[in-house]
Amino acid sequence: MIAAQSAAFYSNQKLSILVIDRNQEPTVGKKTINGWICGDAVGKNTVDYMTERIKISWGNPEIEHPVKGVMAFSPDRETSIPFDGDGFMLNRQQLPRRQLSDSKKMGVNVQFSVALRSLMYENGAVVGVEGTNLLSNEPFKKTAKIVIDATGVTSMLRNGLSINSKIERKIDRDDLESTGRHIMKFEHGIDDKIDFDPDYCIIHLDQDIAPGGYGWVFPKGQDKVNIGLGVQQKELQKRNQRLGKNDDVTKLINDYVKINKAMKNPRLSDDPSDSVNVTGNWQVSVRRQNDCLVANGYMLVGDS
């Protein structure tokens, strides 16, 4: 939606812009059946940049909680590295609804319930997209002067790009982390800023807890967190073999919650603003940015 809003703003709303979403309107931007399983931490400078450039400002309820930075802890938890910088914890269920509202006010059109499968080509250029209308099961085709791909790291459009381009189409499996998280409420247990700090996003580096990745405890209030972890699959296999276990990501997350001494009686959030987004797993890219982001008639944004 940010790409659409930017295009609308800089064209003075003179471009015809269409956003295509596979979801129905009430769940715009939803990643999986479980919710918007993606990052909800953002730097204040990024939000300020957006406000300055395209005159969009976020507030409550899409911004849920302010933070002062990130604190990363070593495996023995004796050493910490601070990364100071104001930021926000976003409510990923509410944010897309705000973005949709802002986009419509800027003249952006939205087509819901369409799953895109491939790009359309003509004379060596991308000229549109095609897929399926999920409500009618009929073919969907739409031409465009430029296609902006925001379908994520597993993009079928990028993977199937068939014109001459410097864009890397396939992503190495080792550059993807299997991740998951719960949004939880809790009572306060032991006052330990290593396990929970309402002012800082906490990262735990530990190859037993999160092999090839890290665990996180991100505050979403005084008694609410986004808690989860990410792992590299081959490192998880090595860890399981070393420890004689057969744990998966979900088991690791649940064990991670159990060892958190600052959280007493943790349970999934019952806030209406989290109603379809309290838990879930997803694949996250941890690689560098694609060296080339454009082809003739085609552009990548975000994780794509």
List where the protein language model places each region.
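Short beta-strand to alpha-helix junction loop
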Residues: 38-41, 82-102, 182, 237-248
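FAD/FMN-dependent oxidoreductases across multiple families
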Residues: 211, 215, 231-304
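N-terminal Rossmann-like FAD-binding beta1-loop-alpha1 element of flavoenzymes
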Residues: 1-19
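Conserved N-terminal helical subregion
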Residues: 66-163
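N-terminal FAD cofactor-binding segment of flavoenzymes
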Residues: 9, 23-71
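Flavin-dependent oxidoreductases
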Residues: 181-216, 266-270, 285-286
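Central beta-strand plus flanking loop segment that forms part of the substrate or channel wall
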Residues: 45-47, 154, 161-201, 258
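A short, hydrophobic, proline-anchored segment that marks a local hinge/packing element in signaling
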Residues: 218-221
